[in-house]
């Protein structure tokens, strides 16, 4: 795609990553009623349709596009902003016809001074919409699948085989496939947008999208272009701004590219909420910011009764995480004094955070100053961000396990991180695959092919059915169950730390800038990990300690390893192709 819009004055030119139209054949073509053809493409994608009518075709037609299906037909009155549209015209015999839906006013608006402009797709494509099914009224002849081709917009460089995940839990495998495809399908705009309703980038959406894109395909352009757009067009929630710091930190860890970081570093200082810091170092909130700004979670019904106050634990947890990341980024650029200042601020404000928000009587973090209420968010955000002291973690974890999924699909990214990072992978995986309507199992069982904006329609009646912020398992299963993450910027050294839960096995392929990591582990009476690292990459490895295990072997030879907190920590860095056995 070309640069986004035209007259934007930025130090960094705005671009969109390359996207193109791919031709896709239907999986089935049927006639549900006389004169009606129903075309099913198997999955939802953003696009339009190319139709080749038979020779001699004439008369009128109506083409219906739909995301939802009901009673064997496209649902023409879907809930909320689930997509349905139609286009009518006259057949042109012997001509290949591109049929596109009408323009949607909201997701093509170009700004009113209050709302960022929607991302426009190329005019030469015609209008695109998310759809799986097409119904054609007035089809003038025999139905042949070759007559119908969906023109679907995806990343031009997407590589389907770049990543893989498979485990002993078939539901988990289906969740992975749903989330991976969700990342692919939502690349249609060249930057990360929040779904079809608005087609606008938001910082939190973009960061979650970035993590899952990294886990499913080796691409950095989408995240970088989304970041540059959001620096120009920031959005309203308080906690969304620090997500831009998270995005740059994630890019730095993936690429080690200081040249990209350097011209963006100063802009990040405007995203860490320093303008709202009081004399004690905490971020404060006025009445307007409490009413609209401090978001905690979205939709608002997902906040677990959170009590908003003049200084709250969630906003301050985000502030501290951003400060910690800024210290690392400053060091990466050789800004030694700034890095030191950030570290000192983090230590000082972190102590105030503990004193202000930790409730010694309950062992939990309170929502804010002046309340003893403890929402789940006030506890998993600090835990995920490394703010909870070691001696306080057990109580916080117990609370999280008891509470369950009392947060949105957005915040679930951080709830899962908090649990996986602190030895509760069994419970994290159980939440992913739980019965009921607040899990990814519910999404896959619903038949959706792209993740939703919310757990269910009843939790957000106007939700999109094409929202990549609901695809967190794409990165969580790669990072934690397979266990691969960068140990140093640029992946010169990886950390391999598989979290097994109750799974008997898992295997997969993790894309990195240095080439794919292949992981295959089995967890039974012992633990076996087959690992293949790309050339030029080393790995620090730790593995589960099977009950009663006493020794670790690497390629058949006894390895130096230390037993710590139920895991064997290998003392020497590994490279190439290795087999690790715990006995």
Please place each PLM-identified region on the residue numbering.
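Hydrophobic h-region of N-terminal signal peptides that target proteins for export
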Residues: 5-16
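Well-ordered alpha-helical scaffold segments within catalytic/enzyme domains
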Residues: 139, 208-217, 244-260, 318-336, ...
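Active-site acid/base region of carbohydrate-active enzymes
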Residues: 133, 143-221, 225, 235, ...
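Positively charged n-region of N-terminal signal peptides that target proteins for export
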Residues: 1-3
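Non-catalytic C-terminal accessory modules of carbohydrate-active enzymes
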Residues: 20-22, 72, 344, 351, ...
């Amino acid at each position: 795609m070309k640069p986004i819009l035209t007259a934007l004055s930025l130090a960094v030119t705005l671009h969109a990553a390359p996207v193109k139209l791919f031709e896709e054949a239907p999986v089935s073509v049927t006639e549900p009623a006389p004169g009606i053809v129903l075309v099913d493409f198997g999955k939802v994608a953003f696009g339009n349709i190319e139709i080749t009518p038979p020779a001699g075709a004439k008369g009128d037609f109506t083409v219906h596009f739909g995301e939802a299906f009901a009673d064997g037909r496209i649902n023409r009155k879907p809930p909320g902003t689930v997509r349905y549209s139609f286009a009518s015209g006259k057949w042109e015999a012997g001509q290949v016809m591109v049929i596109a839906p009408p323009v949607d006013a909201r997701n093509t608006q170009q700004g009113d001074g209050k709302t960022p402009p929607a991302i426009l797709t190329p005019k030469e494509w015609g209008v695109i919409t998310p759809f799986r099914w097409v119904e054609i009224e007035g089809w003038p002849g025999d139905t042949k699948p070759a007559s119908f081709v969906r023109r679907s917009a995806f990343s031009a460089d997407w590589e389907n085989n770049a990543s893989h995940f498979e485990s002993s839990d078939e539901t988990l495998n289906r969740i992975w496939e749903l989330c991976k495809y969700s990342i692919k399908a939502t690349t249609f705009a060249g930057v990360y947008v929040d779904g079809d309703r608005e087609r606008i980038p938001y910082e939190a959406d973009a960061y979650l999208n970035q993590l899952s894109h990294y886990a499913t395909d080796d691409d950095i352009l989408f995240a970088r272009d989304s970041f540059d757009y959001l620096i120009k067009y920031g959005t309203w929630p308080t906690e969304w701004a620090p997500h831009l710091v998270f995005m740059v930190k994630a890019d730095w860890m993936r690429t080690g590219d200081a040249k990209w970081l350097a011209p963006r570093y100063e802009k990040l200082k405007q995203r860490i909420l320093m303008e709202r810091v009081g004399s004690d170092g905490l971020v404060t909130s006025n009445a307007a910011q409490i009413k609209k700004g401090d978001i905690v979670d979205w939709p608002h019904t997902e906040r677990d009764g959170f009590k908003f106050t003049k200084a709250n634990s969630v906003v301050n947890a985000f502030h501290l995480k951003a400060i910690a990341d800024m210290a690392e980024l400053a060091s990466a650029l050789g800004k030694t004094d700034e890095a030191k200042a950030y570290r000192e601020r983090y230590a000082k404000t972190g102590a105030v955070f503990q004193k202000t928000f930790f409730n010694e009587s309950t062992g939990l973090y309170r929502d804010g100053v002046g309340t003893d209420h403890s929402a789940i968010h006030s506890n998993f955000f600090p835990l995920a961000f490394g703010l909870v002291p070691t001696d306080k973690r057990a109580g916080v974890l117990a609370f999280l396990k008891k509470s369950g999924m009392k947060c949105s699909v957005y915040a679930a990214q951080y709830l899962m991180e908090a649990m996986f990072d602190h030895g509760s992978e069994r419970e994290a995986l159980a939440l992913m695959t739980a019965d009921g309507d607040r899990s990814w199992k519910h999404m896959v069982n619903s038949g959706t092919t792209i993740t939703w904006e919310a757990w269910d329609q009843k939790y957000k009646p106007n939700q999109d059915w094409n929202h990549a912020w609901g695809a967190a398992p794409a990165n969580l299963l790669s990072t934690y169950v397979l266990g691969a993450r960068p140990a140093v910027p640029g992946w010169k050294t990886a950390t391999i730390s598989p979290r097994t839960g109750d799974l008997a096995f898992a295997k997969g392929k993790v894309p990195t800038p240095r080439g794919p990591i292949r992981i295959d582990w089995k967890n039974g009476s012992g633990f076996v990990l087959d690992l293949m690292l790309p050339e030029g990459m080393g790995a620090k490895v730790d593995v589960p300690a099977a009950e009663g295990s006493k020794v670790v072997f690497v390629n058949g030879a006894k390895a130096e390893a230390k037993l710590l907190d139920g895991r064997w920590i290998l003392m020497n860095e590994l490279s190439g192709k290795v087999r690790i056995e715990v006995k």
